[in-house]
Design a protein with these regions (language model features):
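Catalytic machinery of carbohydrate-active enzymes
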Residues: 1-326
Length: 326
């Protein structure tokens, strides 16, 4: 059995998909279990190839009662905490970045200046398991009662310094609605007031606010069938990449070279005005604050044109189900 640790969020899971697929291909007859937060379960189902999810919210003791895994893979971080969490299970072999403090001395070195997708592909390649960094697509879920063809504006982010100002998001939403877009505003339950403020300032109807009304699987379905996504450096942007939905992503303080969409896909555009010196406190980071409404609207025009010109549609169904992969 293969146990993989990636106990993080939406964007973290999405950027780990190529590595997960590589492990599935390398060990087709083995059970593959993924350690991830329970609330990510609907999204884990869309990855394909994962037999079982082990629920864990971050690092710490893992309630594991089964036999020691034959192989444990740390796709979570550079250690030492994540290394020790897996080592405590006494796996037959541990694949991880080198971290002498945690007793891991045979792995590749960690590089801070590296795209998150490439980081885990490189680690597996070091151990002889090649991964395709472009293998980012997720299975496209049925939208059910969710609206299709909408423009998703997602103003939230975990850190307030990564949130573009409400008046600017509202100005973009107002302009796009005026151009004929059906705009919806998404977010977590804790971001409902933020989403409502954007919608109100943009003159959108109350039912345009979907923040807190969707779980992560429904959010994925909404993005999969959307016309456009406008958001910051968040998991929603990674969902847009996974479904080839046209997107404009606003970055800061982290550069898109570390977390952005593939640069060879012009229907996704990452805007970044950095580098700028980091500022303390919750204020919007200068690299993000430097982006104006005209910058975003111009990028919208470019990504929609690129999406319309795309000659070969991205496969709609995503990876085949597990039953056909083994």
């Amino acid at each position: 059995m293969i146990l993989v640790l990636r106990a993080l969020g939406v964007g973290d899971l999405a950027t780990g998909v190529p590595a997960l697929r590589a492990l599935r291909a390398a060990y087709p007859g083995e059970e593959l279990a993924l350690v991830a937060p329970r609330w990510l379960a609907p999204l884990v189902d869309l990855v394909g190839g994962v037999d079982r999810q082990v629920h864990a919210d971050g690092l710490g003791h893992l309630g594991w009662s089964g036999p020691s895994p034959e192989l444990a893979v740390n796709l979570h971080g550079r250690g030492p905490q994540s290394h020790r969490m897996l080592a405590a299970l006494r796996p037959g072999r541990l694949l991880a970045f080198a971290n002498p403090e945690a007793g891991a001395v045979d792995g590749p070195p960690w590089r801070a200046d590296e795209h998150e997708v490439d980081r885990w592909c490189r680690m597996l390649a070091w151990y002889g398991t090649p991964a395709d960094r472009s293998d980012l697509a997720l299975r496209r879920p049925d939208p059910g009662p969710l609206p299709v063809g909408v423009t998703v504006v997602h103003p939230g982010a975990k850190a307030t310094r990564r949130r573009w100002p409400v008046p600017r998001f509202a100005a973009v939403a107002r302009e796009l609605a005026g151009r004929g877009h059906r705009v919806v505003v998404t977010g977590s339950p804790g971001e409902r007031d933020l989403a409502a403020a954007v919608a109100r300032a943009a003159g959108l109807p109350a039912d345009a606010v979907l923040a807190g009304a969707t779980d992560v699987g429904e959010l994925a379905a909404l993005v999969a069938h959307a016309r456009l996504v406008v958001c910051g450096d968040t998991g929603v942007g990674h969902l847009a990449t996974a479904y080839a939905t046209a997107s404009v992503l606003l970055f800061g303080p982290v550069a898109p070279a570390h977390w952005g969409p593939p640069p060879d896909r012009p229907w996704h555009e990452a805007l970044w005005a950095g580098p700028h010196p980091s500022a303390d406190g919750p204020a919007v980071h200068p690299a993000l604050a430097a982006l104006g409404v005209p910058d975003v609207l111009a990028a919208v025009g470019r990504v929609e044109t690129a999406a319309a010109r795309r000659a070969v549609p991205v496969q709609a169904s995503g990876p085949p189900p597990l039953a056909t992969r083994r």
